[in-house]
């Protein structure tokens, strides 16, 4: 979990996490927590998406009324997303800006930077293009890891409940309660999963410029 990207401060039962381990094993965990995690490497990879730095391939978007700090594509997409929201979802617009706008209050608390979040959402939106198929499968694989870990924790929780019921476990709380709380909190790639809240209908997606479509397609 530490190597994947679950930070110590995001764990449930932090005191119990290493209390039952031998010193040499605690040292191994500390080393894992201080080294680059999978989530950090994914963030760096997403930030390197090249397409938004080349203004020449974004013909047709130059006349967008630009919002300060936003690429013309994201200015248009932001408007389309706002139009897609139901009356009960209007607060999602603020969440959109917090996640994707540079230099926001939420940026410091998130492990994915705004640039990485925009790149991941772009991959999800246009995953039908050949160049984005493998990146989308990678992102989807990260979510499957979380799902499998959650499934394992749930089965483990049920096994502990059958074995000791509501007896106190080694963590000082009932074993079932500890495992349930850990299962609810330990989602490593939660920020990737939350990006689906910002999708719109595929038929309403902005049409990409021909030059961009060529870059995302098969080279002939």
Where are the predicted features?
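Extended amphipathic alpha-helical segments with heptad-repeat/coiled-coil character used for oligomerization
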Residues: 1-60
């Amino acid at each position: 979990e530490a190597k994947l990207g679950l930070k110590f401060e995001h764990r449930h039962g932090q005191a119990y996490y290493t209390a039952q381990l031998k010193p040499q094993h605690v040292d191994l965990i500390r080393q894992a927590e201080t080294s680059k995690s999978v989530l950090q490497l994914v963030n760096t990879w997403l930030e390197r998406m090249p397409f938004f730095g080349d203004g020449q391939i974004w013909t047709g978007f130059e006349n967008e009324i630009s919002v300060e700090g936003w690429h013309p594509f994201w200015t248009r997409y932001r408007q389309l997303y706002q139009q897609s929201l139901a009356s009960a979802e209007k607060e999602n617009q603020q969440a959109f800006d917090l996640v994707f706008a540079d230099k926001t209050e939420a940026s410091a608390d998130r492990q994915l930077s705004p640039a990485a979040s925009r790149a991941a959402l772009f991959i999800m939106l246009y995953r039908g293009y050949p160049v984005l198929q493998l990146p989308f499968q990678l992102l989807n694989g990260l979510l499957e890891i979380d799902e499998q870990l959650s499934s394992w924790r749930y089965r483990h929780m049920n096994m502990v409940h059958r074995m000791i019921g509501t007896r106190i476990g080694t963590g000082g709380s009932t074993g079932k309660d500890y495992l349930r709380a850990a299962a609810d909190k330990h989602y490593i790639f939660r920020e990737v999963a939350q990006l689906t809240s910002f999708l719109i209908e595929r038929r309403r997606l902005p049409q990409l410029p021909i030059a961009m479509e060529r870059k995302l397609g098969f080279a002939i």
